[in-house]
Every structure is written in C-alpha cells, then in structure tokens.
C-alpha cells in the first residue's frame, strides 16, 4: 500500500520522502511529521471564523484605547442656567479726609512678580506693590514661588529665611510629613524725585518671600524653570495641580508662621497681629484662603487674624480653573480627632462641596466667599457684572457669590493703573540709543526728564557706576515735538528695511496682542480693507493662539503692500518698540477686555486708539463726538450718576471739558448688526482726521500731547487712584474683623 506520509518508528529503515507541503518526513526523529487533519485545506467557514476573531481583537483594542482616552478627558459638567436677583452696585466711595495712623503690613500672594512675570498678572502685582510701598502707608510683602530662574539674576541677593513643616497625604491616604524652605530678597522700588516732594521719608524695598520646593519627591522638583517662559511648566512626576495645591498650602503655613509672636512656639496661639492684610491674586491661589480660614477657625492665627482680600483679574480664564477633587483631598488636613477616615473626609468635603462639579472643584467662588472683601480689576465691568449687564461663560459658578458680597458692598471694582517704568517712550534705552525718544517740555515728559537726570548724575561726578546701558550723549531727545520723534521712528524702520519709502507718508495702524478669538480678530479683514481704501498701512504683531494663524498670514497675500504680519517672538522683541513709537493708530477690536493695557500703552506712545471700547477700555477711551451715538448718550447719563463718587475738582473738570477736547479714540460696537460698517467708518474717520493734522502740525502736536496725558492720568499712584482705593478697601475689611488703623 502506498502512502503519502511516512511514520517514524522501529520499523522505519530511514526511508524519507518530501511531503507535498514542502517538508521532509521520516529519518527516525519524528520531525516534520503532520497529522492528517493539518493538511486539510481551509474552507469558507474557517476564513469567516478568522475574520470574526480578528474583528473581535480590533474591537477590544479600540475599546481599551477609547476607555483610556475617556478616562483622561475632562468630565462633562452640567450647569443649569438660572436667573439671579437684581443687586445695585454701590462701589467704593473714598473719604478724602481719611488719615491712617498705622502703616499696615500687606502680604500679596501671586505666581508672578518682578523678573518672574510672564503676563499681565505679574505686571499688575509688581506695579501695585511698588506704588503701595511708595505711598508709605503700607509695608508691602510679596509671597511667590522660588523659581530656579531667579538664581540666575545677578545681584538679587536671595537668602535663606527658615524651614517649615508641611503635611500632605500619600497615595494611600496616610499623613506624610515634609519640610519646605522659605527664602527672601529685597525688591528695590523704582523712584523719582517727585516721590519725595510731600514726604521726605526713604522708600524701603519690598520684601519678597520665596516658597521653595519640598524635601520629598515629587515636590522637590517644584518651580524648576530655566527662564520666565517656563514658570508654569511642570517636570515629569509632578502634576501641575499638585504644584498649585502645594504652593497654596505652603503659603498658608508660612503666613501662619509670620503672624505669630517670635517669642511664642510655632504651634501656640498668637496674641499679636503681625500681618494686617493677606491679598490673594487669581484663582490658582484661591485655596490659600481656604487653608488660612481653617487656621483661623482652629485659633491658630490668634485673636487678631489678618483681613483676607481676593482679586479676580479676569472673568474668563479664572472661572474655568479647577482641580481634581482627589488631588484636593491629598492636601486636606484632618478636621476631627477620629480614626474614622470616612467621617473625617465627609467633614472635609462638606466644606468644599458647594464648589464641586463632576469630579472637579472650581476655586473662584471659594475665593469670593472666604474673602473679607473682593475686587475686580475694572470698576465699570464690576458694575456690569453685579447689575446683570455682562453675560459671561460659567457665570453660574460665581455670580451668586459675587452678589452676596456686593449686597454688603464688599465686591468692588478697582481699575488697574498703568506702570510707566518699563515701556516708556522717554526713558527706554532702545529709543534713546537711536535718538528716537520723546521730548520733554512744559506740557509733558518732565517727570521722565527728572528720572533721566537722576540716572545720569553719577556720570557728571565721575562715578564709575554710571548707567552703561545708554551713552551719556544719548540722554534726552533732539526732537522738539512728539510728532517729529514719531516721524523719525518711521524713518528708522524704513532704513532697516521694515517699512517702504511710501510708508513714510502713510498713516501707520498697529495691532499688538495674542491671536485669539476674544481679541476680535474676526474684524481683521474688514480693518485691512478699510486701511487700504484710506491709503494706510497695517502692521499686525502678535503671538499665535487659538485663532487660525493661516487666516491672519493670508492677509499679507490678500492685501499685499498694505498688511504685514509679524508672529515670531524675536522680531517682536527686536523691533516692537520702534513700531510702537512710529504708529499713528493702535487697533484694539477686542470682544472682551478686563482693562486694556495695550490700549493705554498705545496712548502713552501717541497713538490714537481705534477700538471696540468694551469692558475696561470704556473707562479711559473717549470716542470722537457723535450726537447720534446711543452709547455716548448712555455714557453721559452714567457719568451724571457717578459724579457723586468723584472729588469736587474732578467733577468740575469733567463738566468743563467738552468731548471735543477729551477724545482719544475712534470706537465701534462689535456686537451691533452693522459692526463691520461701524469699524469701516471709525477707520475712515480716524485717517481723515490724521490727514487733516498733516496740514496743521501745531494742532497735531496738541492732540498727541492729549493722548499721552490721557495715559498718564491712569498712573497707579494718582490721587484717588488704585493705591488710595485699595488702602480704603483694606480699612473696610479690617473694620469688618474689628480693627481700625485710623483710631490708633
């Protein structure tokens, strides 16, 4: 019998035969032998089964990946829309006769300050703290993270202050003890001769307290940063939320330590208030108030705890800030002396549950509720928020808390000031080096001239420690007018290939800001068309953000010769100040704006503002006269109501100065049905007026001086300004907790 297969065994004499499957059989080893079933051909049901199996494996893989993605995605939060009660905004009425006999201690809590300022928050807190210190009515301290980049700043003089203990929970919920260090340095406040006209006392530096990393992983990696752009980055192993929560709890532990008598144990109840006010800035630091309030409730802050102030710096991003509840629980202290962890956690959650939605806790409302007084950075917007005219995303999370404080007149708007120290067309080294700085005369620039003289005084005395940033010959300006200085800036850009010869006689419109939707970038095409039709030039200078960059860069192609887009940081750093000095107009078409610092800086550089005038912009932008404009009529009525809160001399000035002599901008309504046509008209009116000014240089110079002075009127230390208002608010908060510095 023949066979297709050979079977090895005792009777096999080494016969082998290549099988039809390409292998060999036989040889006594049994290798290469196949059972008869292995040689069957696959039928259709075999292929179907394999296909079903493969499909099942793919489905399982997709399910696994999808589950992982869904687990890491933010929880969907359902917030019911609701109607809020009507509350009339009262505002802050200053008492011009108030005399404070005690210099109070103020501690600002912030993520940014001084050289470690990445955005507007750092600029605002730095300027406010400096102005408060110069007022001499407040002894100012700043508490911030110890970013490693600070070690690279020469001459800063950071010194170790003290180590402090801190408790957190480990991954198993057990108490974990760690130690963190606090360092400090002195921040020299910029000074000018006029600071000593009415008060000869020396202006002492601001003390900056640095909260360092912990001594336990991963908190020993906190606050690592090579430069200012990295201060919000987090190293691997340390979640961003853990870093924020660690900072908040460490700050509270440090403030508790500071508010004690040095002769008393750290854990003893204090009997003397060492800190009068703790001023917390922003939602990322709001939990500081929670930890401090817990210390106050336990008596750990003594019989005289500090007043707690909370400032909201915007009404969009801050409201969205939140932490995972499981992360918050990691940094909670035990509230009861019980071994029942579930009972303890229930009591802890009971305190924060009103602020929890889904698996996240939103901190803004907590900060508002726990503070003795709350501020927003714009008076007009605070009024609109309270009285229901401003609709904003996630308002349901905070508006109830805001109204509770507003009913007690403890939610007030204090409009930010403008700091003229850094970005100043009189004193900036880059402008002085090329003789592009603005001139000083009896109308403007006298204060800056005093500063320049003070800076260069050592050079006249042969002191080797003179200002080496700018040669002594470059001090001051050869220009007799602001107009001629701006023309020189245009020519400087032309000689460096950044403007054309034609641009020297065209009005220059400048946009400065982030490329994001709420900056009104949807109006760029309309603005480009209007600028081109009126013979102008548009420079768009900003940083990429959530608005499609291609939509912006395409404008260069669509409006060749009219529009230039500058989106790289280096070009902006190298040439931005020269574009500011040369610009005739600043375009600010924002849909939302808490204050509008860019617009204020534009006025300081002699640029008329073309803007939407929304939010805080409405407080200092005055539109050209237009009797048919409903907004102007509404503003006039509002001004009549608010005169009662102004000093008498300001009321008289407002009544005596007509709009024709006050306007500094051309406004349009970004929410009107004809918003684009309004913008077109605003640009047309602005350029038409500019062309008229070219034939009347003296009138043009008067107008430029008006623009500059309207910016200078927003200084932090102006009479009745932010410094005076915050001092009055601190007094209100201190009175609320039973302390009055006027009676001391």
Each model region followed by its residue ranges:
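Short, flexible loop motifs at catalytic/binding sites
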Residues: 1
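Catalytic cores of carbohydrate-active enzymes across secretory and cytosolic contexts
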Residues: 4-9, 14-744
